[in-house]
Amino acid sequence: MAFFTHQVIRGLSSSAVRNAAIKHVTIIGGGQMGAGIAQVAATTGHSVVLVDTNEEILKKSAKGIEGSLKRVVKKKFADKPDAGAEFIAKVMANVSISTDAASVVGSTDLVLEAIVENLKIKQGLFGALDKVAAAHTIFASNTSSLPITDIASSTSRLDRFGGLHFFNPVPMMKLVEVIGTSATSQETFDSLLAFSKALGKTPVSCKVRSSDIPYYTILRYVHLQDTPGFIVNRLLVPYMMEAIRLHERGHGSKEDIDIAMKLGAGYPMGPFELLDYVGLDTAKFIMDGWVEKDPDNPLMQPSEMLNKLVAECKFGKKTGEGFYKYK
């Protein structure tokens, strides 16, 4: 009965506000991810406001977007300089910047967050914007590891909240993970899927449907769609952690494990190379959050070697040393 009642409530709440096509987008966070998403959205004809509390970061991001577009022009408009200049001008006209999120979300169709990977900060942001955003506005997070359900809990628009996980560098990577919670309305989820496709991306759905699983497992798996790490990171991070454990147990050197996965599985990078690229601090942060959520899961157990390297501030390529040393 509780499950049925919940579905009825969901149906009422989601039908109260019909989601039209997403045309106006507010992106919170002027870092590399936020700027990349802004570039792709503007290139595909969306009106974009890029928001950050630091105006210098915004200016740097806008300059970075223009520089990225110039590289595109060199390839696509090599023999048509006027057309290339027109292309850049048209895309940049779709982008504006602001340091005040509250002043720009009143008429936006989508608020997409790409800020620091901290649950309380994300909750605080969305909780504040929920009070001033338009009723039809969809909220979405670009989190790579935090549960969308937890982030959405700070708002009153649970049916209009989802996840859009892009991959870096955004202009080049085709994949977008579209995440729905047990409260996300189908209309909202469909709007996020359509938006991803409008960006020229290939979306994968991280939202389970009751028709996809046996009836007797529905209650058990009702939150499967919001599993830690969604699809890519949920598979990738345990893979990298098991590589570390394999090395810790003395079953293979990091060099041999990397070579084995590149030549045997066809991966472009081995797990240790990938860890150094992602950042060991980032990997540890993700694992710590997962362990807290699911402490008995053997796939999510910590690694002494990883913890030691992070404690020594050896985060990988960005610090010059991780599992490998970099000049």
Segments predicted by a language model, with ranges:
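Rossmann-fold dinucleotide-binding core
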Residues: 138-225, 230-233
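NAD(P)+-binding Rossmann beta1-loop-alpha1 motif at the extreme N-terminus of oxidoreductases
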Residues: 2-71, 132
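Rossmann-like NAD(P)-binding element
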Residues: 53-60, 70-78, 83-139, 145-146
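Rossmann-like dinucleotide-binding cores of NAD(P)H-dependent redox enzymes
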Residues: 53-88, 178-189, 211-215, 229-235
